[in-house]
């Protein structure tokens, strides 16, 4: 059995597998946003070579990124063809996940080229200034910007930009623990 056919795709996250310039998933803790994003990017990266930039506003080390989650999901599914280092994650077909913080790299991020998908994790912390520089950087034809976040303030730049005033090319989905097929008793107790 092909491992990709065994990956469970929660109904709320099916739009991750359809082309949209912006894919924005928001909601409370336990909504499976990060896990669903990682699975979708891994599976799509196995089908065709992708350059995937994983970012957040502040990232002082790789440990503060989604690197560990992506690594764990690859190991969970026992996927072959992946090479995992402390800096990046590569597939034998050319797919590459790489990780950068925005706040301390925003000017160097402008020179990053050829990104197919940019995943902005904890997007509620990303400043409007960072969004203004990041969006035009992800300019490859057919490229996408994915954002996942737990809302904090309605004044957060991501909430204003994508939830209250979504661009026409955006799919914006609010999710909760009810959309999470992996929701465990530990989270329920909280």
Language model features with spans:
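Short, flexible loop motifs at catalytic/binding sites
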Residues: 1-190
